Protein backbone atom coordinates (compact mmCIF):
# COMPACT_ATOMS: atom_id res chain seq x y z
CA UNK A 1 0.00 0.00 0.00
CA UNK A 2 1.36 3.42 -0.96
CA UNK A 3 2.16 6.06 1.69
CA UNK A 4 -0.89 7.83 3.07
CA UNK A 5 -1.43 11.53 3.71
CA UNK A 6 -3.71 13.10 6.30
CA UNK A 7 -4.21 16.84 6.84
CA UNK A 8 -5.66 18.07 10.11
CA UNK A 9 -5.56 21.63 11.47
CA UNK A 10 -1.94 22.78 11.05
CA UNK A 11 -0.47 19.27 10.84
CA UNK A 12 0.12 16.88 7.94
CA UNK A 13 0.89 13.22 8.60
CA UNK A 14 2.59 11.02 6.01
CA UNK A 15 2.41 7.32 6.91
CA UNK A 16 4.41 4.49 5.38
CA UNK A 17 2.01 1.56 5.13
CA UNK A 18 3.86 -1.60 4.22
CA UNK A 19 4.59 -3.12 7.66
CA UNK A 20 4.77 -6.70 6.38
CA UNK A 21 7.89 -5.69 4.39
CA UNK A 22 9.37 -3.48 7.13
CA UNK A 23 7.97 -0.51 5.17
CA UNK A 24 10.44 -1.00 2.32
CA UNK A 25 9.79 1.57 -0.39
CA UNK A 26 9.00 0.54 -3.96
CA UNK A 27 9.29 2.55 -7.20
CA UNK A 28 5.67 3.73 -7.14
CA UNK A 29 6.16 5.14 -3.63
CA UNK A 30 8.67 7.75 -4.82
CA UNK A 31 6.32 9.89 -6.96
CA UNK A 32 3.56 9.35 -4.37
CA UNK A 33 5.73 10.82 -1.61
CA UNK A 34 6.80 13.72 -3.84
CA UNK A 35 3.14 14.40 -4.64
CA UNK A 36 2.31 14.43 -0.92
CA UNK A 37 5.04 17.00 -0.28
CA UNK A 38 3.83 19.11 -3.21
CA UNK A 39 0.31 19.10 -1.80
CA UNK A 40 1.61 20.08 1.64
CA UNK A 41 3.63 22.93 0.15
CA UNK A 42 0.46 24.27 -1.45
CA UNK A 43 -1.53 24.12 1.81
CA UNK A 44 -1.00 27.48 3.49
CA UNK A 45 -2.35 26.30 6.84
CA UNK A 46 0.07 23.37 7.29
CA UNK A 47 2.97 24.18 9.62
CA UNK A 48 4.23 20.74 10.67
CA UNK A 49 4.67 17.44 8.82
CA UNK A 50 4.98 14.16 10.73
CA UNK A 51 6.61 11.30 8.82
CA UNK A 52 5.79 8.00 10.48
CA UNK A 53 5.16 4.34 9.68
CA UNK A 54 3.01 1.41 10.65
CA UNK A 55 4.34 -1.68 12.37
CA UNK A 56 7.60 -2.59 14.07
CA UNK A 57 10.05 -0.79 11.77
CA UNK A 58 10.27 2.78 10.54
CA UNK A 59 11.58 1.85 7.10
CA UNK A 60 14.03 -0.63 5.61
CA UNK A 61 14.96 1.66 2.74
CA UNK A 62 14.54 1.08 -0.98
CA UNK A 63 14.42 -2.17 -2.91
CA UNK A 64 18.03 -2.55 -4.12
CA UNK A 65 16.87 -4.39 -7.24
CA UNK A 66 14.94 -1.28 -8.34
CA UNK A 67 17.75 1.28 -7.95
CA UNK A 68 18.81 1.14 -11.61
CA UNK A 69 15.22 1.25 -12.85
CA UNK A 70 14.35 4.28 -10.72
CA UNK A 71 17.42 6.14 -12.01
CA UNK A 72 16.46 5.38 -15.60
CA UNK A 73 12.89 6.55 -15.04
CA UNK A 74 14.12 9.91 -13.76
CA UNK A 75 12.39 9.69 -10.38
CA UNK A 76 15.15 8.61 -8.05
CA UNK A 77 15.11 7.93 -4.34
CA UNK A 78 17.41 10.91 -3.85
CA UNK A 79 14.95 13.26 -5.53
CA UNK A 80 12.22 12.13 -3.17
CA UNK A 81 14.44 12.70 -0.12
CA UNK A 82 15.41 16.16 -1.40
CA UNK A 83 11.71 16.99 -1.66
CA UNK A 84 11.33 16.13 2.03
CA UNK A 85 14.27 18.35 3.02
CA UNK A 86 12.94 21.25 0.95
CA UNK A 87 9.40 20.95 2.32
CA UNK A 88 8.15 24.38 3.36
CA UNK A 89 6.72 23.14 6.67
CA UNK A 90 8.79 21.84 9.57
CA UNK A 91 9.23 18.07 9.38
CA UNK A 92 9.42 15.43 12.12
CA UNK A 93 10.45 11.81 11.55
CA UNK A 94 9.10 9.34 14.11
CA UNK A 95 11.53 6.42 14.18
CA UNK A 96 10.69 3.14 15.89
CA UNK A 97 12.48 -0.18 15.45
CA UNK A 98 14.90 -0.21 12.54
CA UNK A 99 15.83 2.48 10.04
CA UNK A 100 18.01 1.10 7.28
CA UNK A 101 19.73 2.17 4.08
CA UNK A 102 18.15 5.07 2.24
CA UNK A 103 15.56 5.42 4.99
CA UNK A 104 18.29 6.83 7.22
CA UNK A 105 18.64 9.67 4.72
CA UNK A 106 14.86 10.16 4.67
CA UNK A 107 15.00 10.68 8.41
CA UNK A 108 18.02 12.99 8.21
CA UNK A 109 16.15 15.12 5.67
CA UNK A 110 13.60 15.91 8.39
CA UNK A 111 14.14 18.85 10.72
CA UNK A 112 13.57 16.76 13.84
CA UNK A 113 14.00 13.04 14.43
CA UNK A 114 12.20 11.58 17.42
CA UNK A 115 13.47 8.09 18.10
CA UNK A 116 12.40 5.16 20.22
CA UNK A 117 14.91 3.54 22.55
CA UNK A 118 14.36 0.26 20.67
CA UNK A 119 15.58 1.76 17.38
CA UNK A 120 18.73 0.97 15.44
CA UNK A 121 20.26 2.19 12.18
CA UNK A 122 22.34 0.53 9.48
CA UNK A 123 23.75 1.87 6.21
CA UNK A 124 24.74 -1.19 4.11
CA UNK A 125 25.51 0.56 0.79
CA UNK A 126 29.21 -0.43 0.62
CA UNK A 127 28.40 -3.99 1.64
CA UNK A 128 25.83 -4.22 -1.16
CA UNK A 129 28.12 -2.69 -3.78
CA UNK A 130 26.23 0.60 -4.10
CA UNK A 131 27.75 4.09 -4.13
CA UNK A 132 25.33 6.40 -2.32
CA UNK A 133 24.02 9.47 -4.18
CA UNK A 134 25.62 12.90 -3.74
CA UNK A 135 22.84 14.68 -1.86
CA UNK A 136 22.67 11.86 0.67
CA UNK A 137 26.41 11.95 1.30
CA UNK A 138 26.22 15.71 1.75
CA UNK A 139 23.30 15.41 4.15
CA UNK A 140 25.18 12.90 6.31
CA UNK A 141 28.20 15.21 6.53
CA UNK A 142 26.10 18.32 7.22
CA UNK A 143 23.92 16.68 9.84
CA UNK A 144 26.33 14.27 11.53
CA UNK A 145 29.85 15.39 10.63
CA UNK A 146 32.51 13.82 8.43
CA UNK A 147 33.82 11.28 10.95
CA UNK A 148 30.38 9.88 11.76
CA UNK A 149 29.49 9.76 8.07
CA UNK A 150 32.65 7.78 7.30
CA UNK A 151 31.99 5.45 10.21
CA UNK A 152 28.50 4.65 8.99
CA UNK A 153 29.13 4.48 5.24
CA UNK A 154 32.54 2.83 5.17
CA UNK A 155 32.21 0.27 7.99
CA UNK A 156 28.45 -0.42 7.68
CA UNK A 157 28.31 -0.39 11.49
CA UNK A 158 24.98 -0.71 13.25
CA UNK A 159 24.17 1.97 15.82
CA UNK A 160 21.88 1.61 18.81
CA UNK A 161 19.32 4.25 19.72
CA UNK A 162 21.62 5.72 22.37
CA UNK A 163 24.46 5.93 19.85
CA UNK A 164 22.11 7.55 17.35
CA UNK A 165 21.22 10.20 19.93
CA UNK A 166 24.87 10.68 20.82
CA UNK A 167 25.99 11.31 17.23
CA UNK A 168 23.08 13.67 16.50
CA UNK A 169 20.95 11.39 14.35
CA UNK A 170 18.12 11.64 16.87
CA UNK A 171 17.15 15.07 18.17
CA UNK A 172 14.82 13.48 20.74
CA UNK A 173 14.74 10.03 22.34
CA UNK A 174 11.87 8.35 24.20
CA UNK A 175 10.81 4.91 25.34
CA UNK A 176 8.30 3.12 23.09
CA UNK A 177 5.59 3.92 25.64
CA UNK A 178 6.47 7.64 25.67
CA UNK A 179 7.25 8.08 21.98
CA UNK A 180 3.84 9.36 20.90
CA UNK A 181 3.64 11.81 23.80
CA UNK A 182 7.05 13.20 22.83
CA UNK A 183 5.92 13.61 19.23
CA UNK A 184 2.65 15.26 20.28
CA UNK A 185 4.48 17.72 22.51
CA UNK A 186 6.95 18.70 19.80
CA UNK A 187 4.21 18.97 17.19
CA UNK A 188 2.13 21.21 19.45
CA UNK A 189 5.12 23.44 20.18
CA UNK A 190 6.02 23.89 16.52
CA UNK A 191 2.47 24.37 15.25
CA UNK A 192 1.97 27.20 17.75
CA UNK A 193 4.82 29.25 16.26
CA UNK A 194 4.41 32.13 13.82
CA UNK A 195 4.58 30.66 10.30
CA UNK A 196 6.63 33.38 8.61
CA UNK A 197 9.72 33.11 10.84
CA UNK A 198 9.19 29.37 11.35
CA UNK A 199 9.36 28.60 7.64
CA UNK A 200 11.91 31.27 6.84
CA UNK A 201 14.42 30.30 9.52
CA UNK A 202 14.07 26.61 8.69
CA UNK A 203 14.86 27.31 5.05
CA UNK A 204 17.80 29.59 5.75
CA UNK A 205 19.32 27.38 8.45
CA UNK A 206 19.38 24.49 5.98
CA UNK A 207 21.02 26.69 3.36
CA UNK A 208 23.58 27.98 5.85
CA UNK A 209 24.46 24.38 6.76
CA UNK A 210 25.26 23.78 3.09
CA UNK A 211 27.24 27.00 2.73
CA UNK A 212 24.56 28.42 0.41
CA UNK A 213 23.27 31.29 2.52
CA UNK A 214 21.68 34.21 0.69
CA UNK A 215 22.14 37.38 2.74
CA UNK A 216 19.70 39.39 0.63
CA UNK A 217 16.99 36.73 0.94
CA UNK A 218 17.51 36.56 4.70
CA UNK A 219 17.21 40.35 4.94
CA UNK A 220 13.98 40.26 2.93
CA UNK A 221 12.50 37.60 5.18
CA UNK A 222 13.53 39.52 8.30
CA UNK A 223 11.83 42.64 6.94
CA UNK A 224 8.74 40.67 6.05
CA UNK A 225 8.33 39.56 9.68
CA UNK A 226 9.06 43.06 11.00
CA UNK A 227 6.20 44.38 8.88
CA UNK A 228 3.84 41.48 9.62
CA UNK A 229 0.57 41.41 11.51
CA UNK A 230 1.86 38.35 13.34
CA UNK A 231 4.66 40.34 14.99
CA UNK A 232 2.06 42.72 16.40
CA UNK A 233 -0.05 39.77 17.52
CA UNK A 234 2.94 38.09 19.15
CA UNK A 235 3.77 41.20 21.12
CA UNK A 236 0.17 41.71 22.20
CA UNK A 237 -0.17 38.08 23.28
CA UNK A 238 3.07 38.34 25.28
CA UNK A 239 1.84 41.45 27.10
CA UNK A 240 -1.60 40.00 27.71
CA UNK A 241 -0.20 36.61 28.78
CA UNK A 242 -2.31 34.64 26.33
CA UNK A 243 -1.56 32.26 23.46
CA UNK A 244 -1.01 34.12 20.18
CA UNK A 245 -3.32 33.58 17.22
CA UNK A 246 -0.92 33.71 14.29
CA UNK A 247 -2.26 33.96 10.74
CA UNK A 248 0.89 33.80 8.66
CA UNK A 249 0.72 37.39 7.49
Named regions from a protein language model:
Residues 1-54:
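Conserved CoA-thioester-binding segment of acyl-CoA-metabolizing enzymes
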Residues 156-163:
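Acidic, divalent-metal-coordinating active-site segment for phosphoryl/phosphodiester hydrolysis
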Residues 114-119, 170-216, 229, 246-249:
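C-terminal long alpha-helix characteristic of the crotonase
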Residues 138-147:
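Hydrophobic, secondary-structure "cap" segments at the distal end of domains
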Residues 83-129, 158:
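Glycine-rich beta-to-alpha active-site loop
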Residues 4, 31, 45, 53-86, ...:
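Glycine- (often His-adjacent) and acidic-residue-rich active-site loop
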Residues 236-249:
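Terminal low-complexity tails and localization/encapsulation signals of metabolic enzymes
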